[in-house]
Swiss-Prot record:
PANTHER family: ISOLEUCINE--TRNA LIGASE, CYTOPLASMIC (PTHR42780:SF1), SOLEUCYL-TRNA SYNTHETASE (PTHR42780). A motif ('KMSKS' region) lies at residues 590-594. IleRS has two distinct active sites: one for aminoacylation and one for editing. The misactivated valine is translocated from the active site to the editing site, which sterically excludes the correctly activated isoleucine. The single editing site contains two valyl binding pockets, one specific for each substrate (Val-AMP or Val-tRNA(Ile)). This is Isoleucine--tRNA ligase. Catalyzes the attachment of isoleucine to tRNA(Ile). As IleRS can inadvertently accommodate and process structurally similar amino acids such as valine, to avoid such errors it has two additional distinct tRNA(Ile)-dependent editing activities. One activity is designated as 'pretransfer' editing and involves the hydrolysis of activated Val-AMP. The other activity is designated 'posttransfer' editing and involves deacylation of mischarged Val-tRNA(Ile). SUPFAM superfamilies: Anticodon-binding domain of a subclass of class I aminoacyl-tRNA synthetases (SSF47323), Nucleotidylyl transferase (SSF52374), ValRS/IleRS/LeuRS editing domain (SSF50677). Belongs to the class-I aminoacyl-tRNA synthetase family. IleS type 2 subfamily. Its main location: cytoplasm. Monomer. It comes from Clostridium novyi (strain NT).
Length: 1038
């Protein structure tokens, strides 16, 4: 009837078998096709780059992204799950440069742009098979056979439509400004790309003396963290609100901020004059490096609000060619712009001492030069956060150039409004990391001076006219001899000319491609080739109900999605977002190849399986927190949840197969057993709780609720009901046990299906499909179980939960006293209200206690120690801690402990403080310990006391329990079946022989022994029975 299963469970083999079943039955496609008439639920899959290998961070994103769509399919939604590939941009180009052994744009041009672009195109799916393999192994169900691909002409055409729409809204413009620039890649970067590449670096700073014009030995002391920009200096910035001083030192007069003088100046000095910064404004000084003569007035002091007294001298060197703040100041005061650096980040020929040298490498040479000519006051190492290229790791320069921008500053208010509509998990992303980024949003520099990307569809004429093309049809209409099969990439698109409608001359496409983040941010509509086709599909599936990616996407995909949808559609493109933290090694350190601590996800999947890996990520921590990950962590996850569920499943199949129990024959049977009613009530409460959690995207909470339920199912329900399954007759009570456990298992696999799809399917196939040929063929094609209020009994759940809690506390007290559970004890005192006798009997049986007493006063059996929780109270009331300690010690310790343990607050007064201090379980530490002869345990308002004195009678019973345990283990080790009769033999201990004879009938009954014999000559197993030696042998009765 049921397939035989391995009790240990080889989960990896099981998952391979289930993956084959899904393939053979086309279950994945059937899941995609389900609920054709249902309400749409849209999930966007953030496109990875397929020319890079998947790593453990991608495992996290895939398991999180998979769960919600699975759940929504079971809830009746039509869920779109289209995979995508991000195929353009620097990541691809850099890989090809590496492959070809070339570096930088000049070598690419020499190699040939057409050949280079072809290499890029051919490479983008290099690791597709690895991505597909990982996705299949994980059970990540997205349509990878029909993905959207950002280099396809249809996709590019939709992106062109978006750019044309922005052009028509006057959001797309060309500007000359200082932009973050990668000299190695030869292109500008956007602000959100820059935000992803900051690193703390230690560099030499310069305190530079600028000679005041017309004054002998008088200098303005300025500071810079970028000495290479000094040859382009045209002004010095101060803050007119600050106080400045002129000091005399070693015959020189130096000017700097008053509050920084002591920190900056070395040696003795004398203050000659003190004045407001306003007096400095307009002061002229001599040019520091005379490599270029400026074409405008320069070399004087200006005011700037960004000058602070945090570091430096309160005077900042200003070079408008190389910094955003400097550039704005330059525009404000109409300062000249001296650019002495070429597109590769090297000094031009006019900078004779350092021509052709990369500017960062020139820093020490410049410092040495200034030291020799006396303009360097001093140099110090300074650690600061500096932007690096997010792809090649080169330090960025801020560089003046023509670029194309999207006018995001004009959309700032709408961006913030749309951001507030998004349900962020965690919520603080809205106003924190992402919200702050939006508050300070700048125009998006989307153009890239590169080769492999979506070409910017703007054509320019020498007369000044510009055209933005929004479709292939428009290109053919306005272009000259455009081929029908036009390839929209460079260099082919560069050959397409337009005729200028104003002057009749040829128009040429601007040379740039666009930021690849614009590509991925366009996927909501570009994946459907909107607006050229699939208009209805797009409108039904926009915005997405759910997305999830790593936290760094707040500066990447999360931003580009919101920015583009706000610009085009005036709304947000996603409604719910789970932000994921980073994956760390087992010690909590960032994984890196150099440290040798990178965990290969394929190894873990091969050794431990997908379900265990998935469950680890669902339960290890909240999704947005950093998660430690190692194979050992996954093993522990498997033990806690999967193995527990498997053991319950195995237990059911073992006994149901023995009895040939078919639940379909008992569909209308209703059990009156209290434990059955309790577990069915708990099951339905679980269904409702998990449903509410998943509806609110609380994945960890839902998973932990499920884990707790399975723990109670195994360690309480099954444990308490084993004997019902052992009965030889198929009584109503046994039918009730079977029917209940079957119902729980076949329901729980539906709840667990989105989390652990393989094990859920395995159990479903054996328990449901095996028995019913008309059953739905996969658990993943089933509907979510319905919450049945009629079986929910909150009072029953509360009573049973309290009994179980008391049992766990009793076990804890036993462990604390180092007394095994098999050793009977005389009495247990319980602080809580009385429970019906049924539960008292359970507690006695579970804890091996003769008597229980509810509502007991435990104060006479315990010592209390109540102390302030210093990290909490100390932070709030630091200097009052001694007085708080005194107040606490003067109170009734038992009463205070009971109030705190019951969740009540207690208020105290302390000398010197007007307000009362509230004492709670959060700011107090309550330690309670049983007195001699008693063991205590307590938690959340429940306390128990065990009397630990062991009488001779109790000691004998303890021996018997221990002997029964040893015999049962020997039965298992000998391979006996559960129902096999045995013969028992003991030897080697007269004391225990007396006890065995006294309890012989009981031992026979419990072990199915037909004979007990003593001191025969045979092979025995040596055993320890509570410190006593005993020889035991078992033999199967023929």
């Amino acid at each position: 009837m049921y397939n035989k299963i391995e009790t240990s469970g080889n989960f990896v083999n099981m998952e391979e078998k289930i993956a084959k079943l899904w393939k053979d039955k086309d279950v994945i496609q059937k899941s995609f096709d389900r609920n054709e008439d249902g309400e749409y639920f849209t999930f966007y899959d953030g496109p990875p780059t397929a020319n890079g290998k998947p790593h453990v961070g991608h495992v996290l994103t895939r398991v999180m992204k998979d769960l919600i769509p699975r759940y929504k399919v079971m809830k009746g939604y039509k869920v779109l799950r289209k995979a995508g590939w991000d195929t353009h941009g620097l990541p691809v180009e850099l890989e090809i440069e590496k492959k070809l052994g070339i570096s930088g744009k000049p070598q690419i041009e020499e190699y040939g742009v057409e050949k280079f672009v072809k290499e890029c195109k051919d490479s983008v799916f290099k690791y597709t098979s690895l991505w597909k393999d990982m996705s299949e192994k994980l059970g990540f169900w997205v349509d990878m056979d029909n993905p959207y691909v950002t280099y396809h002409n249809t996709y590019i055409e939709s992106v062109w439509w978006a750019l044309k729409t922005m052009w028509e809204k006057d959001l797309l413009y060309k500007g000359h400004r200082v932009t973050p620039y990668c000299p190695r890649c030869g292109t500008a970067l956007s602000s959100h790309e820059v935000a992803q590449g900051y690193k703390d670096v230690k560099e030499a700073t310069a305190f530079v003396k600028f000679k005041v014009k017309g004054e002998e030995n008088k200098y303005i002391l300025a500071w810079t963290t970028t000495p290479w920009t000094l040859p382009s200096n045209v002004a010095l910035a101060i803050n007119k609100a600050y106080d400045y001083v002129e000091v005399e030192q070693n015959g020189e007069h130096l000017i700097l901020a008053k509050d920084l003088a002591e920190k900056v100046l070395e040696g003795e000095y004398k203050v000659v004059k003190e004045f407001k910064g306003e007096e400095l404004v307009g002061t002229e000084y001599e040019q520091l490096f005379k490599f270029e003569v400026p074409d405008k007035k320069a070399f004087y002091v200006v005011h700037a609000d960004y000058v602070t007294l945090t570091d430096g001298t309160g005077i900042v060197h200003t070079a408008p060619a190389y910094g955003e703040d400097d550039n704005m100041t330059g525009k404000k005061y109409d300062l000249p712009l001296i650019n002495l650096v070429d597109g590769e980040g090297k000094f031009v020929d006019s900078v004779t001492p350092w021509k052709g040298m990369f500017v960062k490498k020139a820093d020490p040479k410049i410092l040495e030069f200034m030291k020799e000519n006396g303009s360097l006051y001093k140099s110090e190492k300074f650690t600061h956060s500096y932007p690096h290229c997010w792809r090649c790791d080169t330090p960025l320069l801020y560089y003046p150039k023509d670029s194309w921008f999207v006018r995001m500053t004009s959309l700032r208010d709408k961006l913030l409004e749309n951001n507030n509509k998004i349900n962020w998990n965690p919520d603080n992303i809205r106003t924190g990391r992402f919200g702050k980024f939006l508050e300070n949003v700048i125009d998006w520099g989307i153009s890239r001076d590169r080769y492999w990307g979506t070409p910017l569809p703007i054509w320019e004429c020498e007369c000044g006219h510009r055209e933005c093309i929004g479709s292939i049809e428009e290109l053919k209409e306005k272009g000259i001899n455009v081929p029908d099969d036009i390839e929209l990439h460079k260099p082919y698109i560069d050959g397409v000319k337009l005729t200028c409608p104003h002057c009749g001359k040829e128009m040429t496409r601007t040379n740039e491609v666009i930021d690849c983040w614009f590509d991925s941010g366009s996927m909501p509509f570009a994946q459907h080739h909107y607006p050229f086709e699939n208009k209805e599909v797009f409108e039904k599936t926009f915005p997405a109900q759910f997305i999830s990616e790593a936290v760094d996407q707040t500066r990447g995909w999360f931003y580009s999605l919101l920015a583009i949808s706000t610009a085009l559609f005036d709304t947000n493109s996603y409604e719910n977002c789970i932000v994921l933290g980073h994956v760390l090694d087992k010690h909590g350190l960032k994984m890196s190849k150099s440290k040798g601590n990178v965990v290969d996800p394929f190894d873990v999947l091969q050794n431990e399986g997908a379900d265990a890996t998935r469950w680890h990520f669902y339960t290890a921590s909240a999704p947005w927190l950093p998660t430690r990950f190692s194979e050992d962590d996954v093993k522990e996850t498997q033990r806690k949840f999967l193995s527990t569920l498997w053991n319950v499943y195995s237990f059911y199949v073992l006994y149901a197969e023995l009895d040939q129990f078919n639940p379909l024959e008992y569909k209308d049977f209703v059990s009156e057993n209290v434990m059955d009613k309790w577990i069915l009530s708990k099951l339905n409460t679980l269904i409702k709780t998990v449903e509410e959690d998943l509806d609110n995207y609380k994945i960890t909470e839902a998973a932990l609720e499920l884990e707790d339920f399975v723990d109670e199912l195994s360690n309480w329900y099954v444990r308490r009901n084993r004997s019902r399954f052992w009965s030889t007759e198929l009584t109503d009570d046994k039918i009730g046990a079977y029917k209940t456990l079957y119902t729980v298992l076949t329901t729980i696999v539906k709840v667990a299906a989105p989390f652990v799809p393989f094990m859920a399917e395995e159990i479903y196939q054996n328990l449901v499909v095996n028995l019913d040929k008309d059953a739905i063929e996969s658990v993943h094609l089933c509907t979510w179980p319905e919450y049945d209020l009629s079986v929910v009994d909150n009072e029953l759940e509360g009573q049973m939960d309290l009994a179980y809690k008391i049992v766990k506390l009793g076990r804890s007290a036993r462990n604390g006293a180092n007394i095994k559970n098999r050793q009977p004890l005389s009495e247990m005192l319980i602080s809580t209200k009385s429970l019906p006798d049924y539960y008292g009997d359970i507690i006695k049986e579970e804890l091996n206690i003769k008597k229980v007493e509810f509502g007991a006063d435990l104060s006479k059996y315990v010592n209390f120690e109540i102390k302030p929780n210093l990290p909490v109270l100390g932070k709030a009331y630091g200097r009052y801690i001694p007085a708080i300690r005194k107040a606490i010690s003067s109170m009734d310790q038992m009463e205070l402990a009971q109030n705190i343990n019951n969740g009540k607050s207690v208020f105290i007064n302390v000398d010197g403080l007007d307000e009362q201090i509230e004492l709670t379980e959060n700011n107090l530490l309550v330690a309670m310990q049983g007195l001699e002869g008693f063991a205590f345990a307590g938690s959340s308002g429940v306390g128990v006391i065990l009397e630990t004195t062991i009488t001779e009678e109790l000691r004998e019973e303890g021996f018997v329990r221990e002997i029964l345990s040893k015999v049962q283990n020997l039965r298992k080790e000998s391979g006996f079946e559960v129902a096999d009769k045995i013969k028992l033999y003991f030897a080697g201990n007269e004391t225990l022989e007396v006890v065995i004879k006294k309890f012989e009938e009981h031992i026979k009954k419990e072990t199915l022994a037909v004979l007990i014999s003593y001191n025969e000559d045979r092979e025995y197993v040596d055993s320890k029975i509570n410190g006593e030696e005993l020889k035991i042998a078992v033999e199967k009765q023929d």
